[in-house]
């Protein structure tokens, strides 16, 4: 790896890359992406990456604002057993980013792939080079991550060298218990902050296990077999993946040797109580379940677990070291054992040094500090328990409001998606946006093949009334083909809510920020009636 990074560094120097230059990468989760990042960081240049499955406009909206000097890209990628050639997309990006002084093409799909006017990866890495790291100030930009961009141009979130190093050393060494001899895996793409955290495993001397492809191809057992094959110590996935394995009836421990896995990390959405039980019963009771919550904004977790902290079903075990987490009510008072806004009352090292193109800091202050002066509001509903663990209830801007009682969406999804007849769901309260005095609580369902709404609806009404409350029972259940999701797989609760409240769909959501933009059509049609 050191030799490859040295070669990439030498190649970037030949292309004129220096301190402060932006190098953008349309690369999958592969060793070349890891080496390229390390080479860019060694020069004091600024890294930014997107997954090659992002659409042209989604990538352009992110990369173009950085005015990059070099683009690193693949000819294509494979997903779910299919090949996708993205050279047309690469060329379109080159045409729309006039600041580019060079484009490097990595033949990933086809060894003979070419694109006129580009430098081949083999040319970039042809000459050996020493691996030197240029000294930079503590807050010098390391990389630019992005907000989801569902309601406008994605915000470029700039994080600094020093803050990321301090934060990731703490998280990986102390919370994840990683170090020499440990093997760290997280299923991610280069377009999600978990890739940035994953590669930081090298800092603590761990072996990083990288995987490119679908977690469900050829079946949901793929990642579990990967863990067994490579002796993964810390196995990281998203909560929806755990829930999918649970609903599919998988029991990895019955077919594979799962003794290597000491901890399972889960993030991206709240992990349900049933999800916790499934890990214990189907993967192994020796596995510490580490449910985590944080954000791209800080490229880490505020709430997570630790080797010396108890695990409670459905809860995040503790606040992260150095994270001054609290729950605030509407008046800005701290509350315990009540649901409130998740806030940070003191700085964390990896907080953004800035937003890109925000010279006076006004957009950054508006994003985090507008509600509680001097206090970071993250936008999640959280309850701190009396034993100092935490429960996440979903995004606070997608709150359900029934009879003046506020409810998060996470509990709702746990019950609804606990049904083996439901593949996915979305719940929206139109009253909250003032769409009408008699707004509705709507539940959109993606049914599994063979299931019918007529059969499912009575069961769900009964389950929600029994397991949550009568207030949680929707006014209507509506079957749809798909739930709109962001490029990183998050449910688009707020954009759908805005569309149903009468906001112009073009103002409510950027289609290019969605993984499945056509899924919006039924919601738009419903709003027009």
Protein language model features and the residues they cover:
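Conserved AMP-binding/adenylate-forming core of the ANL superfamily
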Residues: 1-38, 55-60, 116, 120-123, ...
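A short helix-loop-beta submotif of the ANL/AMP-binding
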Residues: 9, 22, 28-49, 53-56, ...
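Adenylate-forming
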Residues: 28, 70-89, 110, 212-216, ...
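Structural core segment of the AMP-binding/adenylate-forming
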Residues: 42-123, 238-239
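AMP-binding/adenylate-forming catalytic core of the ANL superfamily
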Residues: 50-75, 90, 228, 235, ...
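Conserved pre-ATP/AMP-binding loop-to-beta segment of ANL
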Residues: 104-105, 117-146, 153, 161-168, ...
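Conserved AMP-binding/adenylation subdomain of ANL enzymes
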Residues: 165-183, 193-233, 248-249
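Conserved AMP-binding/adenylate-forming
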Residues: 174, 211, 262-389, 395-399, ...
